Amino acid sequence: MNTTADASQNNNVGPVMRQGELAQAVVEAAEIDNPEKVIKVEDKLAYLRIQTNDEMILKRQTIEEMLGRPFSMNELEVDLASFAGRIDTHVEYIRFYHAKHL
């Protein structure tokens, strides 16, 4: 089964980020902001697929701390190539989730 088919058969959610400083900060923030979750990172050279099961929260403040500079959540859109699940965006956080579970 290929990865597209696999994606439709699980409850994984999370961003697909272009490689770079922001992607690394998002990986670190995902681990900090979701301590009870196992965060899976697939390095695809040009991008990172960052996933966990059911729900992932990324807080602006945590990403800002990882970057070491001020950060606005709309900056995420520039490097967000895609995402798994649904997305709910706010000024202070972004949430990836599933409306229905498999």
Write out the residue ranges for each language-model feature.
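A short, surface-exposed helix-loop junction/capping segment
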Residues: T4-N12
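Short, surface-exposed ligand-recognition loops at beta-strand->loop->(often short) alpha-helix junctions
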Residues: G14-L22
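Beta-strand elements of well-folded, non-transmembrane domains
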Residues: Q19, N34, D54-M56
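Short, intrinsically disordered, mixed-charge
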Residues: E28-E36
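Short beta-strand
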Residues: I39-D43
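Helix-rich interaction surfaces within compact, conserved domain-sized segments
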Residues: K44-Y47, Q51-L102
